């Protein structure tokens, strides 16, 4: 999912972030220079489903190796590295807390040997979940985008892709994955019951185990 920064696209997550986040871009912030292999764009397009799947597969492959080493674990632990997104440490921590409080079959945890990473910078495409040339999954958080929209919602939404959820553009504000559908007044950063149930269902059978089918 990509968060567009164009003023005409305020039908995006569209959440007044200035109050929630303030200025997040350090004066020395450099623009994002890496070229994603695929981007799960914010606005609906024919590329979104494939891009989201590519991102999820990258994470699943990394997690599958860990699950194979500990098949008896009651919950799958997905590890992330937030060191490349220091400006958003609070939002990432909130996203982790939200998801860990909402579901029980999968846990998000910061640590080494990460399954995916968070990054920050400037990008005209806004924020998005993607994969790099080596197939590793990452979430990119754009400075201007996270001033324009509610930063915790943006971060928690993007993290929802890690857990297997696609974008649902026509959904209401109560759906975390609804993207730009609800308009600028929506500040909800919590998954709804259907989203929680879907994540639980996916990971109850070990979403990571399904990675064997896409290797």
From Swiss-Prot:
Its cofactor is Zn(2+). One of its GO terms (molecular function) is zinc ion binding. GO terms for biological process: proteolysis. Disulfide bonds join 173-186. The active site is at residue 158. GO terms for cellular component: extracellular region. The keyword NADP does not apply. Keywords: Disulfide bond, Hydrolase, Metal-binding, Metalloprotease, Protease, Secreted, Signal, Zinc, Zymogen. Binds 1 zinc ion per subunit. It catalyses: Hydrolyzes proteins with a preference for Tyr or Phe in the P1' position. Has no action on amino-acid p-nitroanilides. Residues 1-30 form the signal peptide. Its EC number is 3.4.24.77. It is found in: Secreted. InterPro entries: MetalloPept_cat_dom_sf (IPR024079), Peptidase_M7 (IPR000013). Ca(2+) binds at residue 152. Zn(2+) binds at residues 157, 161, 167. Belongs to the peptidase M7 family. This is Extracellular small neutral protease. It comes from Streptomyces coelicolor. The lineage of its organism: Bacteria, Bacillati, Actinomycetota, Actinomycetes, Kitasatosporales.
């Amino acid at each position: 999912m990509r968060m567009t920064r164009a003023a005409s696209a305020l039908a995006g997550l569209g959440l007044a972030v200035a109050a929630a986040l303030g200025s997040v871009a350090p004066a020395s912030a450099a623009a994002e220079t890496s070229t994603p292999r695929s981007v799960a764009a914010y606005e609906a397009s024919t590329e979104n489903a494939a891009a989201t799947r590519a991102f999820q597969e990258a994470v699943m492959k990394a997690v599958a190796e860990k699950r194979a080493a500990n098949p008896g674990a009651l919950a799958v632990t997905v590890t992330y590295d937030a060191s490349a997104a220091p400006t958003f440490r609070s939002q990432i921590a909130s996203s982790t807390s939200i998801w860990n409080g909402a579901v029980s079959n999968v846990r998000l945890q910061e640590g080494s040997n990460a399954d995916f990473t968070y990054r920050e910078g400037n990008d005209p495409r806004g924020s998005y979940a993607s994969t790099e040339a080596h197939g590793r999954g990452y979430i990119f958080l754009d400075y201007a985008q996270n001033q324009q929209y509610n930063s915790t919602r943006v971060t928690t939404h993007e993290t929802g892709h890690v857990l297997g959820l696609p974008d649902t553009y026509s959904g209401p504000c109560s759906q975390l994955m609804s993207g730009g559908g609800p308009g600028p007044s929506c500040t909800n950063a919590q998954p709804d019951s259907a989203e929680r149930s879907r994540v639980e269902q996916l990971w109850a059978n070990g979403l990571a185990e399904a990675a064997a089918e896409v290797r």
